[in-house]
Amino acid sequence: MSVSKLSAKEIKKVPQLLGETDVIRTLTLLPGISTVGEGASGFNVRGGNADQNLIILDEAPVYNSSHLFGFFSIFNADAVKDVKLYKGGMPANYGGRLSSVLDIRQKEGNSKKFAANGGIGLLSSRLTLEGPIIKDKVNFMLAGRRSYFDLFFPLFDVPELDQSIAYFYDFNAKLNAKISKKDKIYLSAYFGRDQFSAAELFKFGWGNWTSTLRWNRVISPKWFFNASAVYSDYKYQLGADGTTPFEWDSRIRNLVQN
């Protein structure tokens, strides 16, 4: 099995682009990984195509991992615990892709004390909150990010831009509960969206929504049991409001129980 693992701390050591740490762009620095091109967040593994990579976030498949036409990935580095990339010999529980599996896990939150972390970049700002609800038993993590380059449109004094929209945002959440010495419940979710429109010429947007509920039980020092319910929903919308208005919607949605 060929697998590379990166922690959030290692990912943040990589030089940032426009103040944003990009998880997928960091992977292109690993052996056998190449970018699909400048200004794109996809990646190729050992000659495979970008659509041959299975990307999962807390067990939920992600069908579009890009913000801003591929300029950034949807994964907020402040909400990521670690990243595993399987480049060959993928485990049997992963399927549907030929090239690789990118397994991203969200942070579980601080179980001892409350903490906050944030940052302001050239294109977006972010904020992460984490802490205990019941100390050492129930804890949470919340992270949000939004771009604000659309707020500068009025400064250009172009009437068409005043009616234009261009932004992205995403939210990450995770709740962990230790219900007994042997049982834990994990609930995680992600929601993100990109929205663009140019006056009455066109409008389009896309977004992902994933959620995972997992029960973990320790049977013995060598054995444990996991049961998961995973939901993933991807939407893409295209339309226009001019003389020939139209709306076109596309959607991929699935529910998996493991």
Where are these regions (language model features)?
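Periplasmic N-terminal accessory/gating domains of Gram-negative outer-membrane beta-barrel systems
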Residues: M1-M90, V101, K107-E108
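Short sequence motifs at beta-strands and strand-loop junctions characteristic
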Residues: L17, V36-G37, G119-G121, Q163-Y167, ...
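Short glycine/proline-enriched turns and hinge-like loops at secondary-structure junctions
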Residues: G95-R97
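Short strand-turn segments of transmembrane beta-barrel domains in outer membranes
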Residues: G70-S73, K81-P91, S100-G131, N139-R146, ...
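Transmembrane beta-barrel wall of Gram-negative outer-membrane proteins
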Residues: G121-R146, E160-Q195, K203-Y231
